[in-house]
């Protein structure tokens, strides 16, 4: 899954192209993209061109993303740049495995490649698809360990501590 405004910054066209490549050998995965924006029609067209209408779903704007997070396995951030990457923290706190572009501001501060998530080179052909395949090759213990380390790293940031407290109160 991925979350964000459907804008050039979020680079969802790259995500859809890479997911299409990945899906050729992995038919059981689906991609849900939450958000709305000016690139919606362009992305719908790309999904049709790639014949991915049954695998990639543009959900639109959602008030409670945690309902989607709790039913997902992986969070992918494909942004060209990010300020400051709160969505990565939300995904990590939601117990998702995080795969992110190595874009400026956010991901590299939160993720340590291979220790608490995976980073890929943005717009590099097959790099995201290879990262998803890397995730699949991990054992359940490795996935659990990496997600736990990500939560621990996120907890260092005070704003995320407050987010956890609010989440407990309102859950």
Q: What label would you give each PLM region?
A:
Residues 66, 73, 93-95:
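A short alpha->beta transition loop at the rim of the catalytic pocket in nucleotide-sugar-dependent
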Residues 97-101:
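Short hydrophobic beta-strand element within catalytic cores of glycosyltransferases
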Residues 1-21, 31, 38-44, 86:
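A conserved mid-protein helix/loop that constitutes part of the nucleotide-sugar donor-binding site
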Residues 119, 143-171:
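A charged, aromatic-enriched C-terminal amphipathic alpha-helix characteristic of glycosyltransferases
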Residues 65-66, 84-85, 104-110:
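Short glycine/proline-enriched, acidic/aromatic patches that form the donor-sugar handling elements
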């Amino acid at each position: 899954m991925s979350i964000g405004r459907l804008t050039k910054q979020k680079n969802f066209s790259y995500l859809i192209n890479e997911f299409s490549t990945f899906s050729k050998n992995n038919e059981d995965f689906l991609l849900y993209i939450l958000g709305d924006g000016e690139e919606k029609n362009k992305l719908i067209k790309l999904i049709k061109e790639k014949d991915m209408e049954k695998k990639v779903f543009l959900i639109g704007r959602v008030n409670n993303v945690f309902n989607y997070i709790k039913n997902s396995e992986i969070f992918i951030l494909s942004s060209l740049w990010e300020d400051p990457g709160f969505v990565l923290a939300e995904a990590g706190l939601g117990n998702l495995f995080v795969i992110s572009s190595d874009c400026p501001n956010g991901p590299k501060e939160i993720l340590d490649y291979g220790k608490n998530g995976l980073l890929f080179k943005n717009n590099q052909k097959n790099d995201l698809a290879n990262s998803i395949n890397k995730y699949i090759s991990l054992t359940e213990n490795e996935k659990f360990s990496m997600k736990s380390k990500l939560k621990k790293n996120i907890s260092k940031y005070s704003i995320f501590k407050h987010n956890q407290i609010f989440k407990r109160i309102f859950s």
